[in-house]
Amino acid sequence: MDYFLDASKHIQLNQIDEESSDDFMDLVDPLAEPCAVCGDKSTGTHYGVISCNGCKGFFRRTVLRDQKFTCRFNKRCVIDKNFRCACRYCRFQKCVQVGMKREAIQFERDPVGSPTSGASLNGTPFKKDRSPGYENGNSNGVGSNGMGQENMRTVPQSSSVIDALMEMEARVNQEMCNRYRRSQIFANGSGGSNGNDTDIQQGSDSGASAFAPPNRPCTTEVDLNEISRTTLLLMVEWAKTINPFMDLSMEDKIILLKNYAPQHLILMPAFRSPDTTRVCLFNNTYMTRDNNTDLNGFAAFKTSNITPRVLDEIVWPMRQLQMREQEFVCLKALAFLHPEAKGLSNSSQIMIRDARNRVLKALYAFILDQMPDDAPTRYGNILLLAPALKALTQLLIENMTLTKFFGLAEVDSLLSEFILDDINDHSTAPVSLQQHLSSPTTLPTNGVSPLNPAGSVGSVSSVSGITPTGMLSATLAAPLAIHPLQSQDSILNSEQNNHML
């Protein structure tokens, strides 16, 4: 990476010899002008514009990879040194607006040139932003940057892991939207749509934009029931796409699901909440810090001491970090892939630990690629969300346990089977649930598993010939088709139980 320093505003990038750039070191102050894109400290003129290394590298990667971005908001995001990573679409547009030239990149040395020329980690100036293996996604390429073949495979493999996780997240989000739209049509009693349908049909490029902004407070048990059923059902389908979940024994599958379920119920709405004033739910409702006064007794008891802590301990750090969805899907996978979950067999622990390590590597490679200067700190701050998440999970379980123990209300059987019941109790794993967990996911996966890109996880299928024996099994046995099975919806609607957030 050459630091071309601006001796004159009339000197163009393609007129500077790479080997003579050091001649200007003593003539100009590289910090005289800030980066034209984000306002951070500049390191010279890059692609015709005074800019920092971060914006230079971002522009170069975007052009070389021909990446296309979308803005989650109104294409008017603020791009400064604090929030430049929040929206890649607006950042790239800012690069173009201030004068960065695509054609200037061709004057640099060919990024896929001889493997004997390239980046160095021994203090020598970098001649290229990335190695041949990175630019081409070729895991066999080895540059002269001192990195071995194993390390060179990290970036392309990590990118595949995150891409697959992102694809499955989008499919789950879309299915949530579809199920909510169907529930609204069913509630209206006519096949027509209501005023919210237009919002619900918005695309699901990201978890934050998959749902319309919430327009009413969550005030009824019906809202909580809908959220819990749909979220837990889709959690199972998502889990079946994560390698090596389908290779585990039935008992280990259920242990892993039970360990993760309460964390999932907290993570999903937390990521979609834009600020610390309210927790946004997928059915266009929200909960505020004092929203529990509008709920009935049991719902208020379950959420009163959880909602404020979710806002302070999960939502606030996410917003401070400007967490991207790529980071969020990795955080979800890390919470799910917990090899220390009580009761797991030794063989399952080994497989789960290997899968978790792949996600950890993918997350760090992504952060290092996008924000190299802040990578260690950002990586650590994301992982530090885990203790708060576990503490909130324990609080949620305690609330449910007290409710069930003192008979304050009937705890919903679906949540009870997922969160409260002992794994050694055979009633927690009825035959129908075992058959469902043994079947391929009903979500379309294109034959790709997030942690095993070359492996097939099965095609779209439905579970038939199963006689549900419990609330959980009845819910899980319902295939996630575009058109819901009326018989399964009837099973769900017939249960008059209570759910938590």
Swiss-Prot record:
Domain NR LBD: 157-422
InterPro entries assigned to the protein according to its UniProt record, in alphabetical order: HNF4-like_DBD (IPR049636), NHR-like_dom_sf (IPR035500), Nucl_hrmn_rcpt_lig-bd (IPR000536), Nuclear_hormone_rcpt_NR2 (IPR050274), Nuclear_hrmn_rcpt (IPR001723), Znf_hrmn_rcpt (IPR001628), Znf_NHR/GATA (IPR013088)
Location(s) in or outside the cell: Nucleus
Motif placement: 9aaTAD: 413-421
Keyword Disulfide bond listed: no
Compositionally biased spans, kind Polar residues: 114-123, 197-207
Major location (coarse): nucleus
GO BP, one annotated term: determination of adult lifespan
Coiled coil: none
Region Disordered, residue ranges: 109-152, 188-217
Residue ranges flagged as DNA-binding region: 8-83
UniProt note on tissues of expression: Expressed in head, intestine and hypodermal seam cells.
Phenotype upon gene inactivation: Displays mild developmental defect, exhibiting slower larval growth. In response to hypoxia, only 25% of embryos develop to the L4 larval stage, by comparison with 86% of wild-type. Exhibits intolerance to hypoxia in hif-1 mutant background, with less than 2% animal surviving to L4 larval stage. Reduces the survival rate of hypoxia-exposed embryos to 25% from 86% in wild-type animals. Reduces the survival rate of hypoxia-exposed L1 stage larvae to 19% from 95% in wild-type. Leads to hypoxia-dependent up-regulation of nuclear hormone receptor nhr-67.
Domain of life assignment: Eukaryota
Induction: Exposure to low oxygen environment (0.5% oxygen) triggers hypoxia-dependent responses.
Family of the protein in this entry: Belongs to the nuclear hormone receptor family.
Function, in words: Orphan nuclear receptor. Regulates expression of genes involved in fat metabolism and in maintaining homeostasis of fatty acid saturation, such as lipid desaturase fat-7, and acyl-CoA synthetase acs-2. May form part of a negative feedback loop with fat-7 to limit mitochondrial beta-oxidation, in which it stimulates expression of fat-7 and acs-2, and in turn fat-7 indirectly inhibits acs-2 and other genes also involved in beta-oxidation. Acts in multiple somatic tissues, probably cell non-autonomously, to regulate response to a low oxygen environment (hypoxia).
Xref: PANTHER family: NUCLEAR HORMONE RECEPTOR
Protein name: Nuclear hormone receptor family member nhr-49
Gene that specifies this protein: nhr-49
